[in-house]
């Protein structure tokens, strides 16, 4: 007897939910097509088609500045921030578009705060659901996030610190209004964080700032729907403190 795509997806999700027992409780979704490859954004008839895309991993590195493993099948997302490519196996190998509305899971409380963009469906959900049609779309989004973070950091002017300077240090140190000699120190504001990756695991990581809100259950905050073009969409709380991409 054959197995329907819905049954296969649900089986894959059960394997995912039972195989990840970390505090984050990964929520897994497949990426349609072959990760590490790019293509123009699709029209409605192409969205979520699950077909291989034309370019290879070199395009990933050119666009995002990071290498992508050839065997990757999933991408980790945490509150709209790219975390890593995940090697296939942890969440199964799935590329079936989610064109079946009846495959939506029942809403229930869940601790999961991770999300794999793509077209199969989550078991427990996450606080942020992203609409990502293709790998190209994902790369453009990730690059935009990196540029926004860099631009936001550059707009923070360095604040000089002053400290007394002992006699004989420097020829003509600056003086304050009281005539006291001071030296100026420009602090490191952390603007030069490289984006690197392990060949198989982490590519980009999200850094939670001290002011970020503590993790919350996504009970009641997950709203997900599936359109017939295979695009998983939803909306949730995206305010989670200031987050930056770092290596």
From Swiss-Prot:
Please describe the organ and tissue distribution of this protein's expression.
Answer: Expressed by cementoblasts, a subpopulation of periodontal ligament cells and cells located around vessels in periodontium (at protein level).
Record's keyword annotation contains Ribonucleoprotein: no
Which parts of this chain are annotated as the region Disordered?
1-52, 147-183
Organism of provenance: Homo sapiens
| Induction of its expression | Up-regulated by hypoxia (at protein level).
Q: Does the record carry Ribosomal protein as a key word?
A: no
Protein name per the record:
Cementoblastoma-derived protein 1
Q: Which domain of life is it from?
A: Eukaryota
Q: What are its GO cellular component terms?
A: cytoplasm; nucleoplasm; nucleus
What is the organism lineage in this UniProt record? Eukaryota, Metazoa, Chordata, Craniata, Vertebrata
